[in-house]
Amino acid sequence: MWIGNGISELAGAFGTFCNSLLIYEITGSTWALGSMWLLYFLPSLILQLFIGPYLDRWSRKWMMIFALWSRGIIFLFPLIGFVSDTLVPWHVYIVQIIIGLITPIYSPANQAILPNLVSKEQLSSANAYVEGMARLMTFTAPVVAGIVIEYIGIGSTLLFICTALMLSGCLLLGIMEVREEKVERKTWAVEFMEGVRYFFQQKTIVWLGIFLAFVQFGVGVTMVINIPYIKTVLNGNNAMYGYFMAGFPLGYMFGTLLVGKIKFQSRRRLMLGALLIGGVTYINLGITSSLISAIATEIVAGITMAFFSIHNITLCQQTVPNHLMGKIISVRSFIIRAMMPLGVLVGGALSELWGIRPLYILIGAIITTVSLVGLLIPYFAFLDKESINKNKLAA
């Protein structure tokens, strides 16, 4: 499973890289690039909203295999179009829609199946191996994809993606899944509303979600403008784009190594201070004319985001009772991820009107302002509490 996950993460990152380049090279439009991401996020969000309560009722192993094989097959579509020189934007859009529908199936099934494969004592180590591999692939893929596409072309890269995804699905066939007996469950509406009610009763979760939502909005904007930023504004090539995209995950990896070693008296100052620095990195991207400076800025952004994200997750885990964790995370993820399509929409529209640099500065200004509000207003002192009182959910 560990090897299969690694291969699928690498192939998925390659696929995202190829799709983005194909759309931008065919159209030359940031609006078209934004439309591609909207067609990924909107079906993904809709399915995530409805499928959550049903995932535990199906075989997680076969859901994962189905998702991987489906992704491998669907990437044949742009491959055939590219080789036959008939590729048009809607070919890539179809791929994005289907991948958007598959992702809410694969990701939670991948996380949920692990406790069935290892003992409780080994679970922490197993999660570390899986997450470590995912981070490594996230860091490696942009660099490798940029170099590979530069030297062997997009067609050969698409063929590799199809093969790798099919292979990763085959590797999961050996998993011996232990399934629990079916029990009577509440309806989807009851379970969903239960999670929504509890979510909005907890101001810690709500406000951390709001802070993170602003970050995700910025991420959505950069999904549209990163390619033209490197290739047009900074005059880089595909390999340079790969180095730039690898900067953030590389910084994030460094950040995860530092988080546990840095002692703090105020969690609020640590988290929101990191978010403030992250906002400044966006502003620097809007100003700098150096590709090396841009890559270094992304590394710093990754380090700071690791501090904010890990403490954000920790506070959420401290707040939510175990029996509600799945529902709350599902609701929280839906609300946060919903900001990304908005960012994509804004990025696609305003980049055509304002240009690329002003958008980076705008995102940075928004994130730094939100961070300063959280740092300076005494109301947010509740983020420093070591223990958080849990409200009991009414039956």
What are these regions (language model features)?
Residues 1, 17, 32-36, 63-64, ...:
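Alpha-helical transmembrane segments and their helix-entry boundary regions
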Residues 1-43, 201-246:
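Helix-loop boundary and gating motifs at the non-cytosolic
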Residues 1-16, 40-55, 59-74, 91-149, ...:
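Substrate-agnostic recognition of the 12-TM MFS/MFS-like secondary transporter fold
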Residues 22-34, 76-96, 101, 119-121, ...:
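Membrane-interface helix-capping segments at transmembrane helix termini in multi-pass transporters
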Residues 27, 85, 122, 179-183, ...:
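Membrane-interfacial segments
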Residues 46-49, 57, 61-63, 67, ...:
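C-terminal transmembrane bundle of multi-pass solute transporters/carriers
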Residues 112, 116, 158-186, 376-389:
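Helix-loop junctions on the cytosolic side of multi-pass membrane transporters
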Residues 177-210:
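Juxtamembrane intracellular "pre-TM" segments in multi-pass secondary transporters
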